[in-house]
Amino acid sequence: MVKSELLTPRGLRTLAPKNIHYEGTYEGDQATRDHAYHQGTVWPWLIGPYIEANFRLYGKEFVKTAKELLAGFEEDMTVYGVCSVGEIYDGNPPYAPNGCISQAWSVGEILRSMAMIRKYEKAKK
């Protein structure tokens, strides 16, 4: 379910699109944005625990997929927040960045994920 309903190119959604409370975009006045904040927005920092869990399940076989997941952030790091990623993203494509322009824990999880990839690339089969 996580892969099919929550995973996006920018991290994991906080709520599946099939849920009746799902809000696919983070826009509008403050009250509307506050309501949408945990109702389907994508949180980039959740990519770290997702990658870690998959490495524990699949080991080295997950390296290619992990690299593909992180590649989704490369363009954003040169456009929205230079060398950083946004706090949250819309749950619907094209997954527009929102919230603060730079989120330390999201960057930290991307860096931690990169370190996990290097570790598993060096690991014996």
Q: Where do the model's predicted regions map?
A:
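Extended glycan-interaction surfaces of carbohydrate-active proteins
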Residues: 1-43, 71-125
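Short glycine/serine- and small hydrophobic-enriched flexible loop segments
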Residues: 48-56, 112-116
